[in-house]
């Protein structure tokens, strides 16, 4: 067979090259893109076309987003902000948007470089864990809903104590959840307190449920000067379902025993009437919620890694949060390196990654975006849209429904290849027999 290949090389070279082209065609691209015009992007300064500065830089040079998309109406972005930052802190931007295919390129504006801690001897790593859990919930839910926005949550508290701000660090002040001060008629924090709140107007709500995980010491107004173990819960008064957890760590808020900080879980709650209950220490309850509306057929979100140049410390919490099957993560292998604006804005590789938003593709999958829906040498994993060699892959089930056109095309190509090989074998065998007879 090897000798035959050598003899056939001039005639079979084109056939072999043709097969190579067919089976190396339509590779997945490392971009974020969309199947149609029903898409939306949540971002920060790298996609904020409204940001204004007067420092002599070229207009829009801070963008990773192509400026052609500035007037698309499909972008909600704010310089210096993020969904997580707006959710928890006074520094708020009213993110809102709707689409079938949702893309996130934000998160870096709350990172280890900010070093936020709730208390003087708190733990920023606890906040990185909060960030990961927050985005995991957001990504999971936005694979099932079209619309995301923020809403305020009002509450009714029967006591005399007022809200207090106990989580402040540098420029950030926490206001979600809200903490209720100790009632003046109690000498310590060993008492049960509660407040009612109502969630209405959305299909689901993402709210924080947080505790100070460790041993909290009472304030200077607490004569008992004791340590307390935080315990918080939300009770759905309509369904009877209780959500809650307690402090579990043996840490405090002192130089000798640091680490006490807020640990949050992010609940997806249905509309209804709720009661927030604290069995010890400070009562907390949500003041803001992410409003989820308009359920849709399952469509994974796409998340672009949001990080600084290596001169500033970043985290990988959006990558931790972005898990299959509800999320596809996109990144580059190089350090983020900005151009004319500064090192943190205008990276060439991230601009290439976001350039996929300029056009539609046929298929979005774990490996990337497939431009065409005919054939590919890479099988789309968790593919959505009209994917090469296969149509939609169902949720949680890697079983493909074959698209007949690519299969027929492959069959035709295979049939032609077999016929050509048989013809060439017959031709050379006949030619060899004639020459042998003449010899």
Swiss-Prot record:
The lineage of its organism: Viruses, Riboviria, Orthornavirae, Pisuviricota, Pisoniviricetes. GO terms for molecular function: host cell surface receptor binding; sialate 4-O-acetylesterase activity; sialate 9-O-acetylesterase activity. It is found in: Virion membrane; Host cell membrane. Keywords: Disulfide bond, Glycoprotein, Hemagglutinin, Host cell membrane, Host membrane, Hydrolase, Membrane, Signal, Transmembrane, Transmembrane helix, Viral envelope protein, Virion. It is a single-pass type I membrane protein. It is an enzyme of class 3 (hydrolase). It comes from the Viruses. Homodimer; disulfide-linked. Forms a complex with the M protein in the pre-Golgi. Associates then with S-M complex to form a ternary complex S-M-HE. The active site is at 45 (nucleophile), 342 (charge relay system), 345 (charge relay system). SUPFAM superfamilies: SGNH hydrolase, Viral protein domain. Residues 282-395 are annotated as: Esterase domain 2. Residues 133-281 are annotated as: Receptor binding. HAMAP family: BETA_CORONA_HE. Disulfide bonds join 49-70, 118-167, 202-291, 210-264, 322-327, 363-387. Residues 12-132 are annotated as: Esterase domain 1. The chain crosses the membrane at residues 408-428. Belongs to the influenza type C/coronaviruses hemagglutinin-esterase family. Glycans are attached at residues 94, 152, 196, 246, 309, 316, 331, 360, 374. This is Hemagglutinin-esterase. Residues 23-407 are virion surface. Residues 1-22 form the signal peptide.
């Amino acid at each position: 067979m090897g000798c035959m290949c050598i003899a056939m090389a001039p005639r079979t070279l084109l056939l072999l090259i043709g097969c190579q082209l067919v089976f190396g065609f339509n590779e997945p691209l490392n971009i974020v893109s969309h199947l149609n015009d029903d898409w939306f992007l949540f971002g920060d300064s790298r996609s904020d076309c409204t940001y204004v500065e007067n420092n002599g830089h070229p207009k829009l040079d801070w963008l990773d987003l192509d400026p052609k998309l500035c007037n698309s109406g499909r972008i909600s972005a704010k310089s210096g902000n993020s969904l997580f930052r707006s959710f928890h802190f006074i520094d708020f931007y009213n993110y809102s948007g709707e689409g079938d295919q949702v893309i996130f390129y934000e998160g870096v504006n709350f990172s280890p470089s900010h070093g936020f801690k709730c208390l003087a001897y708190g733990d920023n790593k606890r906040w990185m864990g909060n960030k990961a859990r927050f985005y995991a919930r957001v990504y999971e839910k936005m694979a099932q809903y079209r619309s995301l926005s923020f809403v305020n949550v009002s509450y009714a508290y029967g006591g005399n104590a007022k809200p207090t701000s106990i989580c402040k660090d540098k420029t950030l002040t926490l206001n979600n959840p809200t903490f209720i001060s100790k009632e003046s008629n109690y000498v310590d924090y060993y008492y049960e307190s509660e407040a009612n709140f109502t969630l209405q107007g959305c299909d689901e709500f993402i709210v924080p449920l947080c505790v100070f995980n460790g041993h909290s010491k009472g304030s200077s107004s607490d004569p008992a000067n004791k340590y307390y173990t935080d315990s918080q819960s939300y009770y759905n008064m309509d369904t009877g379902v209780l959500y809650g957890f307690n402090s579990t760590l043996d840490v405090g808020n002192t130089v000798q025993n640091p680490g006490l900080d807020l640990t949050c879980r992010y609940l997806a709650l249905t509309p209804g009437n709720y009661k927030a209950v604290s069995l010890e220490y400070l009562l907390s309850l949500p003041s803001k919620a992410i409003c989820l509306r308009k359920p849709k057929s399952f469509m994974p979100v796409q998340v672009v890694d949001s990080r600084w140049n290596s001169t500033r410390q970043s985290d990988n919490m959006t990558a931790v949060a972005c898990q299959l099957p509800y999320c596809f993560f996109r990144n580059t292998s190089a350090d983020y390196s900005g151009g004319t604006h500064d090192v943190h804005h205008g990276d060439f590789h991230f601009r290439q990654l976001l350039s996929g938003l300029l056009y539609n593709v046929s298929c979005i999958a774990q490996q990337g975006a497939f431009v065409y829906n005919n054939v590919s040498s890479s099988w789309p994993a968790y593919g959505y849209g009209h994917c090469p060699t296969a149509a939609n892959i169902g949720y949680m089930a890697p079983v493909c429904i074959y698209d007949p056109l690519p299969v027929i095309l492959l069959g035709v190509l295979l049939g032609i290849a077999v016929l050509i090989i048989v013809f060439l074998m017959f031709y050379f065998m006949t030619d060899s027999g004639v020459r042998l007879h003449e010899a």
